[in-house]
């Protein structure tokens, strides 16, 4: 009996660790895809920024078309029906020149960590509440520099609501708990 109790307690601790690691693990994986996406979009956005009119550039046109393009994807039992990325581009001073949500153009984002750190040659990321009264409304942003040769000319930041990851996290936690119940 003592052996089974010891095994049960050990299994409970292992299970608790697994469940606690699901959320940060999913967020770390998402952060990795955000930096890849930001870096790619920064390269694609360079001509838009150099043109002096990024609000009418290829990136802006692509996001405009994306908003009107329906899509459906069933990803492991989780339905996805819209783009969840929020993308904005700043100049080298941190002034927003393009915003996929059309809310921040002209604003100074130079003090936001994602922009501030990227403008200083560092890895720039932040998590911000969309609604200060709702702790579940956080959005993770990761930024990449927009370069013209060796000169930093701007920052492109990609954000994704943490709530968009909630179904994956909840499903993973349920599966771990269900599997442990079988054991």
Where in this protein do the model-derived segments appear?
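Helix-start (N-cap) segments at beta->loop->alpha junctions
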Residues: 132, 147-149, 157-176
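Juxtamembrane membrane-water interface segments immediately C-terminal to a transmembrane helix
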Residues: 17-45, 172-175
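Internal alpha-helical transmembrane segments of multi-pass membrane proteins, especially GPCRs
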Residues: 2, 27, 170-182
């Amino acid at each position: 009996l003592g052996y089974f109790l010891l095994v049960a307690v050990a299994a409970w601790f292992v299970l608790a660790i697994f469940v606690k690691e699901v959320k940060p693990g999913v967020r770390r994986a998402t952060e990795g895809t955000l930096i890849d996406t930001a870096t790619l979009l920064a390269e694609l956005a360079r001509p838009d920024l150099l043109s002096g009119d990024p609000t009418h550039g290829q990136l802006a046109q692509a996001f405009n078309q994306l908003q009107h393009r329906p899509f459906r994807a069933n990803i492991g039992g989780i339905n996805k029906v819209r783009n969840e990325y929020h993308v904005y581009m700043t100049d080298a001073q941190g002034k927003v020149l393009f915003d996929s949500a059309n809310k921040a153009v002209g604003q100074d984002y130079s003090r936001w960590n994602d922009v501030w750190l990227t403008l200083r040659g560092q890895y720039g990321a932040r998590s911000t509440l969309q609604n200060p009264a709702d702790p579940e409304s956080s959005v993770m942003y990761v930024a990449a520099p927009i370069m013209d040769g060796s000169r930093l000319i701007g920052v492109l930041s990609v954000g994704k609501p943490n709530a968009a990851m909630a179904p994956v996290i909840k499903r993973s936690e349920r599966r771990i708990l269900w599997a442990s119940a079988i054991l």
